[in-house]
């Protein structure tokens, strides 16, 4: 039986949930209906599920969600991952810190040439710094939980997050394009894709 580990982006990123339904909560219901029939198991770490509950009102479908999706965090203290991956991660963080410092220095020089610090300069600094430091990298405990659980279970990771997908690929975790999740689930449920209802515009996720 195939296993999938889910990130919140499956239910919060429009490029992904529109494949199930235009309305966010109905999209979750459609997902659960497919999950019930698919020859597969679905998992989500506890902190990630809590994050989803903070973003979506799960009161009416919480019991059904927890029936179809196993809520389970990785066994962090009994896992091993290749040491080279950690060295690569540390090197990438160091590179990003240097990049962030250069951006800060550049904006500091621009600010020094002005009599006062323009608000748009502060906004630009924040945006560029965030882009340099966070894009395409694991930047939260929840992200790490998703990747580690997929690694532990030898499961397929489903996420539109570039950083998670990039790290997962480094350590050999199976991936599925989140835009294709509905089609994959229909195949595992034995549905005829030719008779499936529309599943959203063909836009890239992430």
Swiss-Prot record:
Residue spans of biased composition, Pro residues class: 195-206
EC numbers on record: 3.1.26.5
Keyword presence, Hydrolase: yes
Keywords carried by this UniProt record: Endonuclease, Hydrolase, Nuclease, tRNA processing
Gene Ontology MF annotations: ribonuclease P activity
EC primary class: hydrolase
The keyword Endoplasmic reticulum belongs to this UniProt entry's keyword annotation: no
GO biological process: tRNA 5'-leader removal
Segments of this protein annotated with the region Disordered: 187-206
Protein name as annotated: RNA-free ribonuclease P
Organism of derivation: Halorhodospira halophila (strain DSM 244 / SL1) (Ectothiorhodospira halophila (strain DSM 244 / SL1))
